[in-house]
Amino acid sequence: CDAVLATDLPEDPFVADRLVGYFPPLLRERFAERMPTHRLHREIITTEAVNRFVDSQGITAYYRLHLQTGADIAQVIRCQLAARSVFGLGRVETDLTHLGLDAVRTAKIRLALTDLAMHATRWFLNHGGADDIAGTIETYRPGVATLVEKLSERLLGDSADAWQEKVDEVTELGLDRSDAAVVAAYDWSPVLLSIVEISEEGHPLDEVADAYLTLARRVDMIRLTRLVEQLPQDRPTDARVRASLREDLLRVMSDATRRALVIGTDNVLADGGRIVKSIAANPDLAHCVVMVSDLRSAVGQEVTL
């Protein structure tokens, strides 16, 4: 908490409601306007922000994200708050609570939401952070919502089948389709954020999505990402290399998409299928580094680990 207290996070308007929510309802009704002048208002906001982060993300999340990105605790909390709001995770969690499912099924869905938040938080940390939490949400939420809603129409083959299977599984438990689509997006969250990021450079969202997902199918990106995720991370150095490899794969795809918007998808990453098959045949860390380097070479840049 002291590390957060020493930053300007407690002054961010996005977390100001933590102060009022800390007090009992009767005190909120009578003294809400005076609470911002409470002599411990920064300490209260900090404690609430840290507690909510741990409650929603887990006690080891900060350590893992810090190890992978070098970010401090305040940066991690800012990005996690942005990630949760961009994907509307609070709404899904509220709807899930109202369903009253058994502990096992509830935990399964919550785990998917936690994974989604982790992926999206890491993405924001690697793409400039979220110093302006509200501004980041305003930039990304509309595009992400549009993509999540229409993702089933854009995916093909095994990716489409896996997506639909997950959505059907969740809707059968009682969540509506919009909530189920968010739950099913945990694998795709970094991709969706990357698509919105590129569209913010002046390209129509639909065109970016079509180009990115076409290239993703060509290299079987989800399968490749899972192979990277399965690499060992027992030692800190392994974890850092794996995280760098994962991020480099995302950057390869974003760079390839930017090129495809200019020269067409048929002229970008044409050899991607061979590369992903090679990784699948030998999914160890060194081989993945070499193969992702091949992907990087296809768009004219080098892998940086």
Regions found by a protein language model. Give the residues of each.
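Ligand/cofactor-recognition surfaces for anionic moieties
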Residues: C1-L305
